[in-house]
């Protein structure tokens, strides 16, 4: 439940930062929600008298989740996409080859991050006298704790695109298109 509260607070952060560039406002909410979650988890774990290693497992999962999200953002909207589009100038086969290679490259770092989270959380939990599998489970909770804000932001994109398309097709002014 503290993950949900952190996600709601992250959504409010997006609302407060909406005067900025929209992508930066969304990113700030996505990055601050896990920080809020970890702070709340710290107080909850202190109240429950759990060892600090459990909190470190949560932190490893939360950090890993943020890193995987940033890597995904890069591979779905950064230079790799532009390079795939540029490869279309030479034909369909090069688009398929470059798309396949970028797709294969895009999973390497997230897999390494997941493996690191598993190793770190297993060793942390074991050092606290808890089974390593419990540490991995707690790290997964940390990773998925702010899924609420992630889903909200992912759902926002298509809605904003559709609103922008409707504004454009209906001949509304540029200022309407700028805010949609």
Q: Which residue ranges define each predicted feature?
A:
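Hydrophobic packing and interface segments
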Residues: 1-180
